[in-house]
C-alpha cells in the first residue's frame, strides 16, 4: 500500500489549469478514478474504498478555488485528512492502566509468539516496566520453548505449565503475577482458525480467568481480504481492544490489514517494523497517512535517531567530519548506529517522495555497508584511527584481506572512497562556515559517498 504513491496520481491528474472558480465533478473525476484503482490494487476493502472516495468527492466538488491556489497541495491535504480519519479510532494507544494484563490472539503463523517478545521489549523501553510472558499454546511444544527463549532475551519472567488446560494455567499465572513485581502480564495463546469453535471457546475461557485490559489481535500485513471475516469472528467472541499489524516494513500492500480498523471500529495500536525484538512501534495514523501519500515520516525518523545517537558523541563525530578528520573508526561507529535505526530500506521509506532512493540503489548501499564493516573490523584500532598507514604498507593490506576474506580491489575501493569522503565532508564544513547549503551538489544519501 505504501507503494501506491497517491501524491504522484494527484500531480499527474491535476496538470490542467482549472479556470472556473468552483471545482466540478469533471475536474476531480480522473484523479478519484486513479486513486480508487490504486487502493484496490493495494487490497484495501471495497467498502472502505467507496466510503473514502465518497468523502473526497463531498469535500472537493462545489468548493470555491482561490486565485493562484495550488490545487495539488489542496487536494493532497484533503486526501491526507481522510486517510487519517480511516486509520484513526478512539483509544489508539495501549491503555495506561497498571498493572497491565494483555491477551494476544490471532491466526496460526501470524507471528503472535514473536510479537509477545517484542511487546515485552516495547513496554520496557516506553515505560520501564518488566513483563511476565505466559505460554498458553499447548498444541505446539515449540511455541513454549520459543517463548521461554524470548523471555530470557527480553529479561522477562517466564510462566508455563506444559500441556495443562490453558484457562487453569492462566488462573495460576495471574496469582503468580500479583506476587512477581512485574507491571505487565502478556499471555501468548495458541494460533487458531476462526472456524474452530472449540479453540475459540478456549480463548473465551482464558479471557474469563485473565480479565485482560487489552485483547490484541496480531495480523500479518500480507493478509488478503479473508482476514476481515476472521477478525470479525475474533471480535464477536472476544471484543478486541486493538490490532498489531506486522510486516509494515516490507513491500506488503497491507490494504486489507489496514482496512480492519475502519470496518470493525477497532484501533490499530502497534505495528511491526522489523524482525528484530525492537521492531515494534506505536501506530500513528497521521504518520502512516503521510507514508501512503509518499510524503515521508520524518517524525519517526527523528525519534529513531534520538534513541540511537548519543548527542555528545554525535557532535564530536560531525565536528570531525566537517574538519575533514573523520577516520575509519568514526565511520564504523556511524554505520553501526545507522544499523540500529533499522535497515536502509526501512529508513528510505520514511523519506519524503522527492528524496526517495530506488530499490536497486538501496540494495547497493546495504551491500556496500556490509562489505565496509567486514573490512574495517579486520583492521587494528591503530589502522582505523590512522588509515594512511594502510596505504603506506602493502603488508597491512595483505593481512586485512586475509582476515576479512575479501578481495584487494574491494579494500582499495574502500580506501579510495574514504579519501573522497574526507574531501567531501571537509568541503561541506567550509560551505557551512560560509553560510551555504552543504548538501547542494552532492549525490547519494546526504553526500556521504553512497
Swiss-Prot record:
- GO MF term set: 7S RNA binding; ATP hydrolysis activity; GTP binding; GTPase activity
The record's section on PROSITE patterns has: SRP54 (PS00300)
**Into which EC class is this enzyme placed?**
hydrolase
Q: List the catalysed reactions.
A: GTP + H2O = GDP + phosphate + H(+)
What are the annotated GO cellular component locations?
A: signal recognition particle
Q: Keyword annotations for this protein?
A: Cytoplasm, GTP-binding, Hydrolase, Nucleotide-binding, Ribonucleoprotein, RNA-binding, Signal recognition particle
At the highest ranks, the source species' classification is: Bacteria, Bacillati, Mycoplasmatota, Mycoplasmoidales, Mycoplasmoidaceae
Domain of life per record: Bacteria
Free-text comment on this protein's domains from its UniProt entry:
Composed of three domains: the N-terminal N domain, which is responsible for interactions with the ribosome, the central G domain, which binds GTP, and the C-terminal M domain, which binds the RNA and the signal sequence of the RNC.
User: Subunit notes for this chain?
Assistant: Part of the signal recognition particle protein translocation system, which is composed of SRP and FtsY.
Kindly provide the name given to this protein in its UniProt entry.
Signal recognition particle protein
Q: Which residues bind GTP?
A: 106-113, 188-192, 246-249
Subcellular locations according to the entry:
Cytoplasm
Which gene carries the instructions for this protein? ffh
Task: Set out the biological process GO terms recorded for this chain's protein.
Answer: SRP-dependent cotranslational protein targeting to membrane
Q: Name one Pfam family in it.
A: SRP_SPB
